[in-house]
Amino acid sequence: NSKVKIMSLEKTACFGTCPVYHIEIYNNGFATYNGKKFVTIKGLHNLEISKNDISKILKKAKEIDFQNLKNEYTENITDLPTTYIMVKNKKIKDYFGAPKKLKELEKMIEDVILNKLEITSF
């Protein structure tokens, strides 16, 4: 039973104290969280995500038609962090102006990881 990465979420730096971290979730429930800068928990942590949580996230991705969203939401503005979200084989760059439904999906992934790390914010 090989593990395949089915989703990831990465937050990049801004000019302030934006949290910088990387999350990967695999089909077998294995997940990694790597807290880089301005986060409560730093370093690489291995986590176990329930199949139910994975199913909920994948269901939400399907509901918002993730595969057909634009590949990039960006604007000519500086200082903002960038979020890269990947579900299955599609990756989206969310810098500015992404639809609310995409933000909700990002938050779902974050909430599952926050819950596993037993913290309220990154």
Residue ranges and their predicted role:
Residues 1-15, 39, 43, 64-122:
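Short, well-ordered, aromatic-rich surface patches in folded extracellular/luminal domains
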Residues 32-67:
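A short-motif feature that recognizes glycine-rich, charge-decorated loops
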Residues 18:
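An acidic/histidine-cluster motif and surrounding catalytic segment
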Residues 22-33, 79-82:
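A short, structured beta-strand/loop element
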